[in-house]
């Protein structure tokens, strides 16, 4: 395999412009490219196959495809990702340089600092904008406000060979998980993501060391992860609120929140303490207040319930310390609270804890805000997946845990729905009747409800998906939006 000389020079120019290199390093960079791609030399005879303004990532993708076509690289997703990360590491400054530059940029403003880091992660294809653009996104109007629907098509599917090879691989213990700080610069394997071009900003939250990185497959603008330096389990306690507000103090243009810390109502990774942050206004942010109340022991804190399908208490204050204490009080009270009339139980008979919260922090209108979303992970014979989990009749749309992002009103729906929903639409407007499997009853209900034709079928199905997600959130709410549920919520507030 030979690398086109003009492409090499285009890449070298960008490595010098964006990486740690100077003009005298051009031969060194060229030889690193030959090593990474297992190439045998430089093609000096042919014109560049790409435009002069091709990005480093576009050049890397061209070389990877060339290497596969010429049998220099196995056509396996993980092998291609490892090579891509190694190539694009050459246009990425070292972690120490990025951290130093981040601190300098922060002196201008927090937003200048995050913009600097975000641009690097997009340029070196750690944040995969091209893949993220494949997601299907739209909004649906509901009585709670507009909710956001995302059908997740960004993450590439592993093929059967890679899955089989991964199963045969011996268990790896370094890094311990996908969030560990040791992933920075890690080569990757069939079971672990390629992270050679990965960089982490070091932060202090309440005097402790944390890392800040962007998410490769973002669900919203500047989707970032704040991770503990140590591999310790998720835990929601007073320190969580301290950390969230410490982050907001440093980066007031971002929100930050945490998944819950117990199964069924938490995120997919409970083994490593982390939060998610970013620059997005979620539907729940704009939810209207229903009832304001005060807690006498926290005079500077205003509290309210929200017009939202899940059960949320919003706390606001200019006094950060009192807000932390109020949030801790609400959480501790909820963690011990039971109401048998609505199947809310803090503990099972054997003492297992069932209650926790999903907290979200933001800085708005010169006040700190903490949204405390009440969670309960009980199961029952009637609801084996969870009493406050998507029930069986909506699981054809969403059956996974309802985590932080969904709680705030953004559905992350599985990629299978793209094809399945197209089949539903074909069924609704066609004469040919065929079995839709898990979507059959839903489709029949739509046929009875609407006068459907080819002009309106897309809007109807999109809207009904939104209504299903609204139901998903209502299922996850502990105090339902019914007379009984509202009275029960008032009893809890009185208990506070």
UniProtKB/Swiss-Prot annotation:
GO terms for molecular function: UDP-glucose:hexose-1-phosphate uridylyltransferase activity. Keywords: Carbohydrate metabolism, Cytoplasm, Galactose metabolism, Nucleotidyltransferase, Transferase. InterPro entries: GalP_uridyl_Trfase_II, GalP_Utransf_C, GalP_Utransf_N. The keyword Transmembrane does not apply. The keyword Transferase applies. Its main location: cytoplasm. Its EC number is 2.7.7.12. It catalyses: alpha-D-galactose 1-phosphate + UDP-alpha-D-glucose = alpha-D-glucose 1-phosphate + UDP-alpha-D-galactose. It is found in: Cytoplasm. One of its GO terms (biological process) is galactose metabolic process. Pathway: Carbohydrate metabolism; galactose metabolism. It holds the Pfam family GalP_UDP_transf. GO terms for cellular component: cytoplasm. It is an enzyme of class 2 (transferase). Belongs to the galactose-1-phosphate uridylyltransferase type 2 family. This is Galactose-1-phosphate uridylyltransferase. It comes from Staphylococcus saprophyticus subsp. saprophyticus (strain ATCC 15305 / DSM 20229 / NCIMB 8711 / NCTC 7292 / S-41). The lineage of its organism: Bacteria, Bacillati, Bacillota, Bacilli, Bacillales.
